[in-house]
């Protein structure tokens, strides 16, 4: 994600109107259906886009606004950095994770999942994240810092991948548009709160899981929609926690 401001430009309304026309007059046929393969970033321009089937995973901190009330800013910065650092490290360790974004206290990844086994792998990513939080909370307690609770949401669907920003400014970003991103974000905002477990997935994720992962999730109704939730952990990380976090 590129967001660094490299150069200051004088804004001119005439140039602005011309750029709007260039964008809005782009050919709809330049938006291609790539199905299950996420194209490389260098294939994106300011006038094209790719439709692709992906799995999105969001993780965010529960009640993060309350952390700002009870912690000094340097403390809060260290807590956030530790959380964000290890969320990115875990997602980045999986080859199928093609995009990672940080938005405030939320980290989300876009995963290429053309096979059923890939969907199981995303559940393994969620389990790693969940186990990592246990280790982080142990270290936070040792510092007498507040501990963190998180919510993780996972959804599979079709997204439109586009490049957005101001051409020539160095300020641009890959934007993922569609229900897959919005729904995964919504699930993360529900997970870990009230009676909900840490991890929530949709029905189209659940039906593609192996029997073992299915057995670790239970169903509930979210209005008229069935969801699945669990508190899945990574066994080797749990063993490390028991051995080293005493």
Residue ranges and their predicted role:
Residues 129:
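Serine endopeptidase catalytic core focused on the charge-relay Asp
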Residues 1-42, 183, 192-246:
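Intrinsically disordered, glycine/charged-rich C-terminal tails and inter-domain linkers
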